[in-house]
Amino acid sequence: MNGLRIKKEAAALLAFLCALVFAGCTGGGDTSSDTVLVNAKAEKFKEFRVEKFNLKFSTPDDWQEDNKDTELDWYCENSSVGMGIFGYYRSDFADSANVTDILSQQSKDNMERYQNVQKVEHTPEFVSTDKKITAELYSAEYEGAKIYQYFCYVEFKENDEFFWVTFSSQPSYMKKNFKMLEKIIDSFEIEKGGEK
């Protein structure tokens, strides 16, 4: 699978970045007020662009880009959740390649560094008409903390690009914010006129 950009080093870096986010989340005390603040800010969104793939999407206003020292195509976060993106081109794979299988393998490779990995039942509420979105939710443990890894596979019906997206956070945050995370994924759009 030479064409497949499964980067174990990048997945390890993502795990490290997630650990930093989790460390900030577990500073002790009640974090419910933090979650309320995040939800309150979720009303105001800002736009990000991943120019390499002509991708644009929106996140809540408190999210920040953090693409230093990462092999991911994009990484951003707020104080409670990290989001990583790998982009691919369908034309770089054999016609017989299954996009979902490619993206699922990326998720499996990413989960290798965690302990007690379990798939969690979750029914996303995507209503997209211009793309196919597949989601998988996993519970795991990392450095003594329980985390959720929420993987979303985004395939555009009319475009060559497709994406592997992961959200990493504590279960308590994730359970309260699935709709907001899914709104981010549903905002994915390919801008016309860009170059490959």
What are the language-model segments listed below?
Residues 2-77, 145-146, 168-196:
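N-terminal targeting sequences that direct proteins away from the cytosol to non-cytosolic compartments
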Residues 69-164:
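Conserved polar/disulfide-associated segments of primarily extracytoplasmic proteins
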